[in-house]
A protein has these predicted regions:
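Alpha-helical coupling/stalk and coiled-coil linker elements that connect catalytic or binding modules
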Residues: 2-5, 18-22, 33, 57, ...
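Helix-turn-helix-type domain boundary/helix-start signal
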Residues: 4-7, 39
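Short, charged amphipathic alpha-helical surface segments
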Residues: 35-41, 53
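A basic, often C-terminal nucleic-acid-binding module that engages the phosphate backbone, implemented
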Residues: 49
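ATPase nucleotide-binding head domains, primarily ABC-like/P-loop NTPase cores
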Residues: 450-690
């Protein structure tokens, strides 16, 4: 696939898309989440790019929604679908599903939709979906406690490119390596020449390090899981709640995630926790140990009776000796006990092991002094030892965890993709169930154009434009149970007549919604739908008021263009007569109907001038009617399903008929009716409607 041939994709965007692992696969699948990981591409832009790629794949010329009202209907039904999603991804993904005239595209989505309608779900699944989001790329990693070392300049450049997470140092000899070991917890020597050297510290000779970067920097693979920890856990929860087949071992992945914090550090290891706590508490524990020793020594001094003869006191003064000498001579045991108390407190407070305890004991000298003070150098040495031990432990645990999770990465990606796609499926399933939808039946043949006929289809199917049984418009702002189901079938071009507020516009909305959803490949709100595959949908809403000359000219020109190329089109028009005076409107509409009929288009024109239009047309125009059964308590009783080949009575005719019936019954006026308002007057009016 030539990326720049996708509508809306230029050189810069194409370059960004090539950064994806499999851009063509993502584009063909409409994988918005993957496309949105390309540099500089948002989810909204990804949806538009995916839609363009799908059009290219199916040789779809676009333009199915040929008018503003047709596009508005699409936006409205799309909004109904999107309102039933949980994730932002699913809402964007639904925008890649659009009405198309291409059979291959429709059938692709139909297969997806049929599977979706079979999905079972409950609130547990929907709740779990709330935590699922597309995976994010981890940020740049910088590991400061490790470094790479080499004596070769070329190797140095290779190392910087292969493992940018670590510093790379040039060393000339073993002494240089030893100096690095004093500044880093771990030094990885890249040169075979360093094999066998003995150096204090953690020095590893790994000539293969650049070929196995994950072993040297386990933070690299772990950063992916750390950054997406909550997203992955949510995807696991979705799979369990929905009883989905998983692309990876859920138990193993969950166990790995439980051992990893969101900052990329290893979690749940007691020894690592001990070392971390010891480092954090070292300064406080050393200070407390000092206080413990001094408190012990002060108490001992208070309780001890010290007797010094004059000659001894004179000798101490002459030697310049102070209290330290006095402690050494008179309170040696008490001082030793105080120091031992400090040492034990430091060791116990930090939970030090034997080797660490040996260093800690040296923090308090055996040489008597008051007050007792810790040796700062020894405390620093202990900190270095603890830090090095922690880094060694963390490094080993990270390598082990990275190895455990290494085989889970692609499966984890698929796990999230499947969870997000489930949200798309459930949105379709919820829409289908809430509006009692069914999958439509297309009656055209194998051609790619909806206007092409097939010799294999039945005679009844060959003629149908659309046939809707038990349809309920999803655009009505009413509960589904409050909407009367509508049956309507049209072949060719028909006029639709009916009383005011009888549901003519709602019928057009129903037809438009059904046709749009069907060409999207989605279920439609009806008991059964058969229709041909159309090339485009022209839906013209009712014009508010008479148009001025310029607007009138533009409207007529638009219909002239449509009439010239109407084959394969579905044309829905609501009261076109409102554009000008009734007489002229009837003539114009008759001419448009003639042209559309000659060109094989399918159309429904709502009009109150059906009788006049039929008289002016040069062919037998089909007139259907939404019939009112009568007036009850001032309200129309209407059969919402259009009656075929029937000119419906108008609202004025129904009112006059009602008045005539009432006039024939004097009791309705409490007595005899004057001649001027008698039944004869209303009967004469009724004759005018014949």
């Amino acid at each position: 696939m030539d990326l720049e041939s996708i509508p809306g994709v230029g050189e810069k965007t194409a370059r960004a898309l090539t950064a994806l692992d499999e851009p063509e696969r993502a584009l063909r699948r409409g994988d918005v989440a993957t496309i949105a990981t390309a540099p500089g591409i948002s989810q909204g832009r990804a949806a538009r790019i995916a839609r363009g790629a799908i059009r290219l794949e199916h040789d779809d010329p676009g333009g199915f929604l040929a008018t503003d009202r047709a596009r508005e209907v699409y936006r409205n039904v799309l909004a109904l679908l999107k309102s039933r999603t949980v994730t932002d991804y699913a809402a964007q993904r639904l925008e890649t599903i659009y009405p198309s005239p291409r059979r291959s595209r429709i059938e692709d989505v139909q297969a997806f939709a049929r599977d979706a309608l079979e999905r079972e779900y409950d609130e547990t699944v929907l709740t779990a979906l709330e935590g699922v989001e597309p995976l994010e790329k981890p940020g740049d990693i910088r590991v400061r406690e490790r470094c790479l070392a080499t004596a070769d300049a070329e190797r140095y450049s290779e190392a910087r490119d292969a493992i940018p997470e670590l510093s790379v140092e040039i060393v000339e000899d073993t002494q240089g390596l030893a100096e690095l070991a004093r500044g880093y917890s771990t030094v990885v020597a890249l040169d075979e020449s360093f094999a066998g050297v003995t150096i204090d510290g953690d020095v590893q000779v790994r000539p293969d390090a650049l070929e196995t970067p994950a072993e040297i920097v386990p933070e690299r693979p772990l950063s992916f899981f750390a950054r997406n920890r909550s997203r992955l856990q949510a995807a696991i929860d979705v799979h369990r709640a929905g009883d989905l087949e998983a692309a990876c071992d859920l138990e193993a992945l969950e166990d790995g995630l439980s051992r990893l914090d969101e900052d990329g550090t290893v979690a749940g290891d007691d020894e690592l926790d001990r070392l971390t706590t010891a480092i954090d508490d070292l300064e406080t524990a050393a200070g407390t140990a000092e206080s413990v020793a001094n408190d012990h020594l002060r108490e001992a001094i208070r309780e001890e009776d010290v007797t010094i003869e004059g000659s001894d006191l004179l000798s101490l003064v002459e030697r310049g000796a102070g209290v330290d000498s006095l402690l050494s001579r008179e309170l040696a045991d008490e001082y030793a006990a105080a120091v031992e108390t400090a040492r034990e407190h430091l060791i116990d407070a930090l939970d030090l092991d034997q080797g660490e305890a040996e260093i800690a004991r040296r923090a308090f000298s055996d040489e008597p002094t008051f007050p007792v003070e810790r040796d700062g150098d020894v405390v620093s040495r202990l900190r270095e030892e603890l830090t090095a031990a922690k880094e060694r432990r963390a490094g080993r645990l990270k390598r082990e965890l990275a190895a455990d999770l290494a085989d889970q990465r692609e499966g984890a990606r698929q796990l999230v993709r499947d969870a997000l796609e489930l949200d798309v499926e459930l949105a379709i399933a919820r829409f289908g169930r809430e509006f009692e939808c069914t999958m439509p039946e297309f009656v055209d043949g194998d051609s790619h154009s909806a206007s092409a006929a097939s010799s294999e289809r039945s005679a009844s199917d060959e003629q149908v434009g659309f046939a809707i049984d038990g349809g309920r418009s999803p655009l009505l702002d009413e509960p589904l149970e409050a909407i009367d189901p509508v049956d309507y079938e049209v072949t060719g071009v028909a006029l639709l007549s009916g009383v005011n507020s009888g549901g003519k516009t709602s019928t057009l909305d129903l037809v438009a919604s059904v046709v749009v959803l069907a060409h999207m490949g989605l279920p439609v709100p009806a008991e059964r739908v058969r229709l041909q595959r159309f090339d485009d949908l022209h839906y013209h809403a009712k014009t508010q008021g008479t148009l001025d000359a310029g607007a009138f000219e533009s409207t007529v020109r638009e219909f002239a263009d449509l009439a010239q190329g109407g084959e394969g089109s579905l044309v829905l028009v609501d009261e076109l007569e409102s554009i000008t005076e009734p007489g002229a409107s009837a003539k114009i509409i008759a001419g448009i109907l003639e042209a559309l009929s000659e060109n094989g288009a399918t159309g429904v024109f709502v009009s109150h001038l059906a009788d006049e239009i039929r008289e002016m047309a040069d062919y037998d125009v089909t007139v259907d009617g939404i019939e009112a059964m009568g007036l009850v308590d001032g309200q129309l009783e209407v059969n919402r399903s259009p009656v075929k080949d029937h000119l419906a009575r108008s609202t004025p005719e129904l009112i006059v008929e009602k008045l005539a019936d009432e006039a024939r019954e004097p009791a309705t006026n409490g007595g005899s009716v004057p001649d001027v308002t008698g039944p004869d007057f209303y009967d004469r009016l009724l004759e005018k409607f014949d």
